[in-house]
């Protein structure tokens, strides 16, 4: 979380834009509706990763990880369908290392 907040403030300061870091799926309904239905003024980066541990949904053939990934994919698809500027990054393997690599690339770009 600290790395994402640092990255967020670096982008804010470099580009002089408002930034926010949110974690799903809890944000998907409330703030997600604003992003998908409000003015086309945002730029979005959706970061997903494999769960370190996954649990099966009782009585189903799929897991909670599959449900979470489906929610993220659906949210991204709606942003894309509405013409929002959005990038999805899926990190596999070591999450901390992947976030460090992503952070370094974004900082170099801004």
Where does each model-flagged region fall?
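Phosphate-moiety recognition in structured ligand-binding domains
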Residues: 1-110
């Amino acid at each position: 979380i600290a790395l994402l907040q640092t990255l967020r403030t670096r982008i804010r300061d470099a580009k002089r834009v408002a930034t926010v870091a949110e974690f799903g799926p809890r944000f998907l309904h409330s703030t997600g509706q604003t992003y998908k239905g409000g003015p086309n003024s945002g730029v979005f980066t959706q970061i997903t990763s494999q769960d370190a541990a996954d649990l099966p949904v009782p009585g189903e053939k799929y897991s909670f990880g599959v449900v979470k990934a489906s929610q993220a994919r659906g949210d991204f698809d709606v942003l894309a369908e509405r013409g929002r500027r959005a990038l999805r990054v899926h990190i596999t393997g070591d999450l901390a290392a992947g976030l460090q690599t992503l952070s370094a690339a974004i900082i170099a770009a801004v």
